[in-house]
Swiss-Prot record:
One of its GO terms (cellular component) is cytoplasm. Belongs to the 'phage' integrase family. XerD-like subfamily. Coiled coil: none annotated. Putative tyrosine recombinase. Not involved in the cutting and rejoining of the recombining DNA molecules on dif(SL) site. The active site is at 149, 213, 245 (o-(3'-phospho-dna)-tyrosine intermediate). This is Tyrosine recombinase XerD-like. Its main location: cytoplasm. Keywords: Cytoplasm, DNA integration, DNA recombination, DNA-binding. GO terms for molecular function: DNA binding; tyrosine-based site-specific recombinase activity. It comes from Streptococcus pyogenes serotype M5 (strain Manfredo). Residues 85-248 form the Tyr recombinase domain. GO terms for biological process: DNA transposition.
Amino acid sequence: MKSYIEPFIASKALSQNSQKAYRYDLQQFCQLVGERVNQDKLLLYQNSIANLSLSAKKRKLSTANQFLYYLYQIKYLNSYFRLTDTMKVMRTEKQQAAIINTDIFYQKTPFVWGQLISLLILELGLTPSEVAGIEVANLDLNFQMLTLKTKKGVRVLPLSQILIPFLEQQLVGKEVYLFEHRGIPFSRQWFFNHLKTFVRSIGYEGLTAQKLREQFILKEKLAGKSIIELSDILGLKSPVTLEKYYKS
């Protein structure tokens, strides 16, 4: 389906800037949807842009719908599909946020600091302050473990194999902390800025550290973790704040 992006763009009278925007949006769309379009994949894409600003969502929906109509016109698609606001999983006080497709978070990027921050939150459910406090001495990549020491106590967290290369890359030359300059940890604003830049670069503008941590919670619950187990993993004093995720 990606091979039809350029012919589609060429069929429209667009400025250079608009062409770039269309190309960027459609490459992301094709990456998530793949070669076979169906309602489930469109819902996945819809959920992936749920946290964007209203204007960004409107632009991406419009671009994707134009492309879908084009594919139907040239008979690449046998059926006409259309993305609408009603397709997404609506979030209310009693409903849970949708699990997003995170494959794009692991792809090569120039924003390596923001990428690693986001992956540590997605993979381990860490808070920004916990990420900032990761010490080199407490990372054991051979045994794939992180010993996290905080005011709340000590937690030993397993590191997934997919996370190891990202950590290895950033450990080079570090003295005390994983995120530091000459042994001094970076500021809270530094972490905020780098995370914001990275998520924006992959089309998830508006996705905060809190929302990334929520993704970890949703995935762990889906994997069968009990509320007590998840509370221990996150280092919470009480599972009360997790109750909303376990309500039927």
